[in-house]
Regions:
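Secreted/periplasmic carbohydrate-active enzymes, especially glycoside hydrolases
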Residues: 1-240, 279-280, 294-295, 311-317, ...
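Substrate-binding/catalytic cleft of secreted carbohydrate-active enzymes
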Residues: 207-210, 217-437
Length: 542
């Protein structure tokens, strides 16, 4: 806007279009609302400015060390320095100095004689025994990037950095060398009172609620989520599939009996290519430094075609540290390399087994399953247990987290929630978007209890004399939990004891009851594993 403003008072006018040509690419199942749903920021930048930074990582095979590179783009002439993990060391670029913590720091000069407006400056640091980021242990470092001009600080940026490696090896998705299982949900951005504008307090509630119910992953269905939500996923520990703002199911569902794709968007239509790829680039460039994002998704229910394949290739070229997801390859197998994993929706477990027997080349996830409309989710354990029977099956994402109801008051003054058709809208999908685990005002339904049990990281089986505990965590020992043993007879509490036990991730421990069950009456033993609080670890104290 620099060329448009002038000294003194300026008037800024914003015109918001309800529909545009891009609306053809936004056929998601949600309320059609108009306006500005997120914060808009107007800012000035100094003469020397950090235009961009991309944090890249590599690790020793045993994760005993890490190499962290900050690729910075700077406009203007000045000095740029990077402080990593709270302390700065001065050194020329390319000659880093090492200090006792094992982290290497650098300081570089942006060349004022370079003619280009933007200059590239890179810093590489070595970290010994890095604290790795995961949903179980969301450890974050702090990087501070400072730009100086004429001996004065012109700009300072603080960036949380999570160190982790996500990869595809031997047909399995691995996080920090361990096979991951996604115990996830799909989440639309929704508030029953403010529509598609979600407050920070509501986002924080969602993250805490998901963590409290053993959910470890979120698919941002079907568009990039608010950056603050991604920040919360970094801090509290949730794995994220970052999804491109693309869905055109209304066009590809018109495929003819002969399989012609004259209706499908984007397909291979050249007029849509740039618009589609621009959406992918915008998401990646905005969100690329969030450790929570493990997978880029090409969108939802947009069939297939060369354009989507080109999007996947863009993701792989621009960011090799993440995998690429697209469920549409199940429907259109002409571009199978679009997705690094097989992905389906609402497939019964028996059919998943049959598919993997015939197509064992890639790992498999359910990007949508266990449709949570009404009194549902009763069969979820069939899926969660299968993830520990078949290594290629690596979990899924429940559809969906929240009911999309609008808070209203009826003529009698009674509060409630409206859905499709309640405003005289015809045709209507009626209650089709009221299909969540929580109500529109974020109250949990009994379905959340079923999810909490099915997604539990500990599988506890009781005999007459002991508890057999299978630790399904990737990185957390059983000693992190309080094990509470409580006995009852005919429903009346009898004895209670708490203990700790060691059991490494992936192993099973047999723990004798701390006291015997009464022989008379209907005796029952209950074992509860309690892990206190949502872990949020950050060296800079966000």
């Amino acid at each position: 806007m620099t060329a448009a403003v002038h000294p003194g008072e300026n008037t800024l006018t914003v015109q918001v279009y309800r529909f545009s040509s891009g609306s053809w690419l936004e056929d998601q199942d949600f309320w059609r609302m108009s306006g500005l749903f997120r914060s808009v920021e107007l800012f000035t930048k100094p003469e020397v400015h950090l235009e961009d930074v991309f944090v890249k990582q590599s690790f020793a095979d045993d994760f005993s060390s890490a190499t962290v590179t900050f690729d910075c783009k700077v406009s203007g002439a000045g000095t740029i320095s990077v402080v990593f993990d709270g302390e700065e060391q001065s050194a020329a670029v390319g000659e880093p100095a090492e200090y006792d913590s094992g982290v290497v720091f650098g300081k570089g000069e942006a060349d004022p004689d370079v003619e280009e407006d933007v200059q590239d400056v890179s810093f590489t640091f070595a970290v010994t025994n890095p604290a790795l980021w995961s949903a179980e242990e969301p450890s974050l470092y702090t990087a501070e990037i400072c730009l100086e001009q004429g001996g004065s600080v012109a700009e300072r940026t603080e960036l949380p950095v999570g160190l982790r490696r996500f990869e595809l090896r031997d047909r399995q998705m691995l996080l920090n060398g361990k096979r991951i299982v996604f115990q996830g949900v799909n989440r639309h951005e929704w508030s029953c009172r403010t529509g598609r504008t979600v407050s920070r307090e509501e986002m924080e509630w969602d993250v805490r609620n998901l963590k409290a119910h053993n959910v470890n992953a979120v698919r941002t269905s079907h568009y990039p989520n608010d950056p603050y939500f991604l920040h919360l996923c970094d801090v509290y520990g949730l794995y994220v599939i970052g999804e491109t703002n693309l869905e055109s199911h209304g066009t590809w569902q018109k495929l003819g009996a002969d399989g012609s794709d004259e209706w499908t968007l984007p397909g291979a239509r050249p007029e849509w290519r740039d618009a589609v790829l621009a959406r992918a680039e915008a998401m990646l460039e905005r969100d690329k430094n969030h450790p929570a994002i493990l997978i880029w998704s090409c969108g939802n229910e947009s069939h297939g075609g060369r354009t989507l394949w080109e999007m996947s290739q863009y993701f792989r070229t621009a960011d090799p540290s993440r995998l690429v997801h697209y469920e549409g390859i199940f429907w259109d197998r002409t571009w199978p390399d679009t997705s690094d994993m097989e992905s389906q929706m609402y497939t019964p477990v028996a059919d998943i087994k049959k598919f993997l027997a015939e197509h064992p080349e890639k790992p498999f996830i359910m990007c949508e399953y266990s449709h949570a409309m009404g009194n549902s989710c009763g069969g979820i354990t069939d899926y969660t247990e299968y993830a520990y029977e078949e290594l290629l099956y690596q979990g899924g994402f429940i559809w969906e987290y929240m009911d999309h109801g609008i808070a209203v008051t009826d003529p009698d003054g009674k509060p409630g929630f409206a859905y499709g058709g309640d405003f005289g809208d015809r045709p209507t999908d009626r209650e089709f978007c009221v299909d969540g685990l929580v109500l529109p005002d974020r109250r949990n339904t009994p379905k959340m209890d079923a999810v909490k049990a099915a997604y539990a990281p500990l599988k506890i089986t009781l005999t007459d004399t002991e508890a057999v505990i299978e630790n399904r965590n990737l990185f957390t020992d059983l000693s992190a939990y309080d094990l509470v043993f409580a006995s009852s007879v005919t429903g009346k509490p009898q004895r209670r004891a708490m203990l700790r036990a060691d059991c490494k991730p992936g192993e099973t421990e047999h723990i004798p009851f701390p006291f015997a069950l009464p022989e008379a009456g209907l005796a029952c033993m209950t074992v509860t594993a309690v892990q206190w609080g949502c872990k949020a670890r950050h060296s800079g104290g966000l």
